[in-house]
From Swiss-Prot:
Pfam families per the UniProt record, alphabetical: 7tm_1 (PF00001)
Species name: Homo sapiens
Gene3D superfamilies: Rhodopsin 7-helix transmembrane proteins
Subcellular location(s) per record: Cell membrane
Identification of the protein by name: Prostaglandin D2 receptor
Keywords, sorted A to Z: Asthma, Cell membrane, Disulfide bond, G-protein coupled receptor, Glycoprotein, Mast cell degranulation, Membrane, Receptor, Transducer, Transmembrane, Transmembrane helix
Ranges in the topological domain labelled Cytoplasmic: 43-59, 129-150, 217-262, 332-359
GO molecular function term, any single one: prostaglandin D receptor activity
Disulfide linkage: 105-183
Pathology noted in the entry: Asthma-related traits 1: Asthma-related traits include clinical symptoms of asthma, such as coughing, wheezing, dyspnea, bronchial hyperresponsiveness as assessed by methacholine challenge test, serum IgE levels, atopy and atopic dermatitis.
Family: Belongs to the G-protein coupled receptor 1 family.
Primary location: membrane
Positions in the Extracellular compartment: 1-21, 81-107, 172-195, 284-310
Length: 359
């Protein structure tokens, strides 16, 4: 009988030498961030791009970020407790619920792939929304409506459900990964099984295209923000009332050039983190599909697969912090006091010194 490729594919206990600490940290951090984000969303709608005309809430971005937050929170609540229960009972997912046989592992892998794909699609929708609102405002005002924003989450969910259910229909395969607390798409090829290879490559290719499109949209938005920053530096008093930002006391004030930097830096941070967390699992899928892994290297290869899956789960942790918490008025006031105000003070001092020296 041919032995399974993965060492833990048929094991019934958690592999020794592994701890639940990492899973607990990921779960608690993700739960805290998403609950805090939901609280902030419940209090007020947050607009991502400050140059967007003021409009009654909720905005399109508000609809999109609500869908992403709910998706991330559901993913954490459905998947992380299962991992922690496996560690606590020292049982692999295949036997954690004996009455379900191997169904728990299959369901875990399905939801893992579903939430990974669904979150990435929603992140692309948010990046596209931000890029259009900054770079193509007339098109945005005419075509991007609240109804369209409200349709994103259900359409994305329906597509992700259909795509991630293909292994249940014989196209692709879900397997248990070491240390026995994870199940996911099989990312190594089997002789005589093109469907396993095909689905793994198809899933990773789709994820790669979504990541590339998201990064390009974010780079386009960053380019527009930088152009605004340069224009405000050259013409600080030429901004119209539509460009005014609400101050902490509720009044509107003309934006200063340095106030564009927090948008630019936050968008750059989001792009870097999103890319770093998404690429490992994409790389591992291609590597496993086309690289002939030797028997003696399987342990290290499975450790790399586990690390890539953990990186993928980090996306749902950083999403609420970057999109909501860091965009909240309280954090913006803190950020401006600590970073923007000192930079502005130095800029004024430098200008005064230059004027005095010229006199």
């Amino acid at each position: 009988m041919k032995s399974p490729f993965y060492r833990c594919q048929n094991t019934t206990s958690v592999e020794k030498g592994n701890s639940a600490v990492m899973g607990g940290v990921l779960f608690s951090t993700g739960l805290l961030g998403n609950l805090l984000a939901l609280g902030l969303l419940a209090r007020s709608g947050l607009g991502w791009c400050s140059r967007r005309p003021l409009r009654p809430l909720p905005s399109v971005f508000y609809m999109l970020v609500c869908g992403l937050t709910v998706t991330d929170l559901l993913g954490k609540c459905l998947l992380s407790p299962v991992v922690l229960a496996a560690y606590a009972q020292n049982r692999s997912l295949r036997v954690l619920a004996p009455a379900l046989d191997n169904s728990l592992c299959q369901a875990f892998a399905f939801f893992m792939s579903f939430f990974g794909l669904s979150s990435t699609l929603q992140l692309l929708a948010m990046a596209l929304e931000c890029w259009l609102s900054l770079g193509h405002p007339f098109f945005y005002r005419r075509h991007i409506t609240l109804r369209l924003g409200a349709l994103v989450a259900p359409v994305v969910s329906a597509f992700s459900l259909a795509f991630c259910a293909l292994p249940f229909m014989g196209f692709g395969k879900f397997v248990q990964y070491c240390p026995g607390t994870w199940c996911f798409i099989q990312m190594v090829h089997e002789e005589g099984s093109l469907s396993v290879l095909g689905y793994s490559v198809l899933y990773s290719s789709l994820m790669a295209l979504l990541v590339l499109a998201t990064v390009l949209c974010n780079l386009g938005a960053m380019r527009n923000l930088y152009a605004m920053h340069r224009r405000l530096q050259r013409h600080p008093r030429s901004c119209t009332r539509d460009c005014a930002e609400p101050r902490a006391d509720g009044r509107e004030a003309s934006p200063q050039p340095l106030e564009e930097l927090d948008h630019l830096l936050l968008l750059a941070l989001m792009t870097v983190l999103f890319t770093m967390c998404s690429l490992p699992v994409i790389y591992r899928a291609y590597y496993g599909a086309f690289k002939d892994v030797k028997e003696k290297n399987r342990t290290s290869e499975e450790a790399e697969d586990l690390r890539a899956l953990r990186f993928l789960s980090v996306i749902s942790i950083v999403d609420p912090w970057i999109f909501i918490i860091f965009r909240s008025p309280v954090f913006r006031i803190f950020f401006h006091k600590i970073f923007i105000r000192p930079l502005r003070y130095r800029s004024r001092c430098s200008n005064s010194t230059n004027m005095e020296s010229s006199l």
